[in-house]
Amino acid sequence: KAIRRQRQMCIRDSFNATYPHKFTWYTGDPAAYRNLLAGKKFLSAAGYGAFVDLLLEDKVHIALSDGVNMRYCPAGAGIPPKYQLLITFDDDSFLVFTVAMYGGINAFRDTLDNPYYLGALSKPSPLGDGFDAAYFDRLVAGAKPNLSAKAFLATEQRIPGLGNGVLQDILFNARIHPKRKMATFGERELDALFGAVKSTLAEMTAAGGRDTEKDLFGNPGGYKVVLSKNTYADPCPVCGGALVKEAYLGGAVYYCPHCQPLK
C-alpha cells in the first residue's frame, strides 16, 4: 500500500546517520546521498533475493541488503532518535532505515558493483519456475561434498535471499539436520530438501513474511515460524520432543534431534 502511494511522491531530503554503525555499508560517501536523491520521484520497488531495490527517477536506486530495517512513517509521526538513513517526501511522510547487526544501504545511479546484488539479479529465484529440480541438482553437483546442509543452503548466496532465518523451517520440513553433510544425502532426501525450499519459501511469501519479522508499517508477518528463538523452548510440533538451539556457522540453528537426526 505504501509503495503504491509513493509512486507520486518526490524525495525532499535525506539525512545521514544519527547513530553511526560500523557494520552499516554504503556505496561511496553517504554524505553525497542528499545530492543524488533529493528531487527524485519514487517509481517502484522490487525484491531480488536478499535485496529490496527502490527505483527512482533518472535510473537512481536505493538497494537495501539483508539486515536493513525499513519503516514507512506518515506525516507527523515521531522520528526515531537513532537511524542509519532517513528520507523525507514532499508530503512530510518519511522512510527510516535502521541496522541492528549488519546491512547495506546502497544509493547509486545505473548499476551497483556488488557480487551479491548482481548474483541476486542474475540467478533464478526459488519462488520462480526457473528454480526447478534440474537447477537444484546442478547446485548440489557444484557444491563440495563435505558441506553441511546449512552451509549449502545459506552461505555464498547460492540461493539468493535464503539465509539463516528461513533456513530453520526449510530443514525441519525436509527432516534434515543442519550439520548433516551433503555427501550423505540420498535421492529421496535431496528431493525432500528441494521440495522444502520451494514450498516453505512460497508459504512464507504468501503469508506476508515470518511472524518474527516486521513489514514496512511495523506489522509482523503472517507466517507462523516453527523453529526460532521464540519457539525453541516449546516441544517439537511433530514428535513432542525437546528442541535444540546451537551456535553453528555464525548464527544459531534450531532443530529436533529426533525428527532431524544427524546421520
Regions found by a protein language model. Give the residues of each.
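Short glycine/proline-enriched turns and hinge-like loops at secondary-structure junctions
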Residues: 56-57, 78, 248-249
